[in-house]
Amino acid sequence: MFNTTFANRTLPDLVEIQRASFCWFLNEGLAEEIQSFSPIVNYTGNLELHLFGDQYTLRYPKHNINECKRRDTTYSVQIYVPAQLINRETGVIKEQEVFIGDLPLMTDRGTFIINGAERVIVNQIVRSPGIYYKSELDKQGRRTYSSSLISNRGAWVKFETDRNDLVWVRIDKTRKIPAHVFLKAMGLSDTDIYNGLRHPEYLKKTFRFEGNYTTETALIQMYNKLRPGEPATVTGGQQLLYSRFFDPKRYDLGKVGRYKLNKKLNLSVPENVRVLTPQDTLAAIDYLINLKFEIGETDDIDHLGNRRVRSVGELLQNQVRIGLNRLERIIRERMTICDITSLTPNTLVNPKPIIASIREFFGSSQLSQFMDQTNPLAELTHKRRISALGPGGLNRDRAGFGVRDIHPSHYGRICPIETPEGPNAGLIGVLATHARINTYGFIEAPFFKVQDGQVYNHSQPIYLTADQEDKYRIAPGDITLDETNRIATKIVPIKYRQEFTTTKPNQVDFIAVSPIQVISIATSLIPFLEHDDANRALMGSNMQRQAVPLLYPESPLVGTGLEAQAARDSGMVVVSIEDGQVTFVSGDKICVTNKKGDEIAYYLQKYQRSNQDTCINQRPTVWLGEDVIEGQVIADGAATEGGELALGQNILVAYLPWEGYNYEDAFLINERLVYNDVYTSVHIEKYEIEARQTKLGSEEITRELPNVGEAALRKLDENGIIVIGSWVEAGDILIGKVTPKGESDQPPEGKLLRAIFGEKARDVRDTSLRVPNGGRGRILDVRIFTREKGDELPTGANIVIRVYIAQSRKIQVGDKMAGRHGNKGIISRILPRQDMPYLPDGTPVDLVLNPLGVPSRMNVGQIFECLLGLAAENLNKRFKITPFDEMHGAEASRVLVNEKLNEAKIKTGENWLFDLRHPGKITLYDGRTGEAFDNPVTIGVSYMLKLVHLVDDKIHARSTGPYSLVTQQPLGGRAQHGGQRLGEMEVWALEAFGASYTLQELLTVKSDDMQGRNETLNAIVKGKPIPRPGTPESFKVLMRELQSLGLDIGAYKIENLPDGQTRGIEVDLMMNYQQSRLFKPLYESMQTKNNENLFL
């Protein structure tokens, strides 16, 4: 028997971290913040404004979630707070309910709708407020100790010892103050100080060295150190000390800071005392001195006991505080300026500061991110992400290896596998499967109690923080237990005080609840994970999030058992909220009648566009008359099948080299995958156009376009708008629009006509919305927004039209595919099915992989998966393999795979399925010749994904296009229709080859020699020889930049004189601009047959 009791239960709700935090904000955080600002008193003290934050109300949102997405508005509620204005002179009390701002509301999926787009607030991991001790060796090898007292808000205090054994205090990195001066200034007497220290003799050295002080002289000395140059007084010192450490508005340890301080220094200060107390300071100095005597221990700042998570609620609370601070200043100013008798709470309170603060946070904060909606797993992982970046966090450029590294305290809390590759590695992590966050923001992991080797795994698990866990001996979740739930092995691997070691079963205190509690959701979806190298498992986890939802989803034959919960918690599937019977089913609606006879309607999303342009489409999975139970999946979403996550397809793969087409991780695929739409996905693009009010008149949406033939308008309706259901190709008109044009926009012939006849050619130009290059598909929807309908439009816009185009993309050469084990590659060739290698029963292989991609990458899990998949296909079964199966015996994976292949061989009677001489390998035949390959080949059924990196979105070419204004070189990138950069290394290659004329041409007329460009074009049009290149524009820019630095620098032409002497003549590089008319191509030569102008 094994420790599977809890592992097989469902995991905790995976999006709870977001929802719980936002609920806390609504229930406590918001009220607490508003209360802390009340009352606001004016400078004379005769007016008081009280805000009753605990009685605030929220008004219902104006539109529902779907309507907000359609209209591009924010799904938010209005906050109203009861307020009371008291005039102390007259005793008049005015009461009103005041509006203080809009608050975006979280959807039940843990997201926010901001300006029509779904966004997620990422959890931030920061250093917890509290006190931290560290030791350092100075240059002479002597050990000095220091500690930092970090507050939630306000000054940081640093206590330090030096090589002379003196104790100092630093406030916010200012000058050092002797420790006893600081203690005396805080009001402690000599007796208090000596009684509070275990080693008072150590501090006496500081007394002797710096002299003794009374409270008054200590305050003056402290004021002099902190504010040098200002006249010091005792009152000034007291005010300075109060404002720095005792004013709750300026200094706040926070609930967490007080808890950590009490715990570290063994104090019993009440939790509601959030400011610094003299006991705190004395205890901090006592602990510092004790470290010198080897009592106590220093802290590890990377330990999860010293780092806490700030979720949505707390981040929002901080933002509301910023808004309230601004509001408080405005209220005080209005109390002073306005007539007291006419003042009311509503005239005092301006909601703009809070609205601006919240909008800034949701719109532009580093932690408010556009939700990754590629597939359900991407969505789920994004909500569970933990970032060390952002305001108050780290900077990726300055973060060292220590912060990024895996720490022993991450065990069961933060996944050691799933993190980005590149500059953010280690700074962005994901919560482990069973982890949760406690009220203080520390991450907790669950464990079962163990006593004398007996595991109590039928009771509720105990959640421990990283600090608590250090005190116990903890065994992993994959050790073997006997029938009575006792640990069956003599020696148990354990984690104790940051070390991994072994011990006897009776020494174990706790055991992990499941082998997968160490890793994240995405990583736990990889079968045979324990056989993969961590680097490849990381790629596998990240690439599952990039899988495109396919037209016909198929769940994996070999899974891990977590697919159903991942799909359910992502919110992509529709779940029945009550028991009942299905009374109506259609493509977009399901009705369930519950036991009371009430009908509950569930509306399905049909062909909605996700943030990443993939298609969200829900399909019913229940029949009319079917009985459903609470929590049952009644409709599948994108990339789910039967309520389980289905990111890819099960296809037949073979590991063999094939004519070099799978060199360097390239894939060779069967045309069946194209023709049978196995890897076809639907993508929805959004195009938008505005008709604006211009200085010359308003733009018009119309079918009457200048110089456009009827053929180009055939798909538009009478208003010039594309008809839904039309098929469009690149360059087709979607919305006809004309813009009035001014005199300067007229071409020369138009000016001539007006000069001769005074006739006005139609003075509008065609600015229609067209399908961009590479775009094609079916018109899915057209949405028209006007002010008359009550839609909110951008300033200056009269009408906004959005067109949605759906396109189905089959798999093609250049697309990226990957397995779940980090085995990724690009499709290099699509072979006819008759040419593919085939099995002894004639089945052609779907995908040919390179066997050299396995040994060096050490991701052997893919081999186990493909062989077990082959057995599953032949046995008509599906397997759920929980990672880390060695607890079932040595080489458990190999035994299982061989066993199942043998079983498949017996059941199907196909002897080739399992051969003892080379288990897992099969004689394969070449489809072109029909001959067997020389050696047996590993074949099997693997779960392969098509990733979002599609060649259609990346392929790009340019003939003519835009140039940069400054350097006059072609722009870069597909979005700008840019050119290919000929960089430094390419120049070296041409230099090495000696291709001087080719190089000169590339660096001048093909790039930024403006005069040469035009002359070359002219020469090509007229069929004349190409002229010599001129000076590149970038050279002129360089000259001008050097001249702007005050350097007298110029370009000179060397001329030979008749007497054999030479002289330099300065060349005017700007001459081209003054005589620019000469270099323009002649107008006649630039005419094409259709009388359209050509421009480079």
Swiss-Prot record:
GO biological process, one term: DNA-templated transcription
Protein function: DNA-dependent RNA polymerase catalyzes the transcription of DNA into RNA using the four ribonucleoside triphosphates as substrates.
PANTHER family: DNA-DIRECTED RNA POLYMERASE I SUBUNIT 2
One Gene Ontology term of the molecular function aspect: ribonucleoside binding
EC numbers, comma separated: 2.7.7.6
Originating organism: Guillardia theta (Cryptophyte)
Protein name: DNA-directed RNA polymerase subunit beta
Primary location group: plastid
A Pfam family of this chain: RNA_pol_Rpb2_2
Entry-linked InterPro entries: DNA-dir_RNA_pol_bsu_ext_1_sf (IPR042107), DNA-dir_RNA_pol_bsu_external_1 (IPR019462), DNA-dir_RNA_pol_su2 (IPR015712), DNA-dir_RNAP_su2_dom (IPR007120), DNA-dir_RNAP_su2_hyb_sf (IPR037033), RNA_pol_bsu_bac (IPR010243), RNA_pol_bsu_CS (IPR007121), RNA_pol_bsu_protrusion (IPR007644)
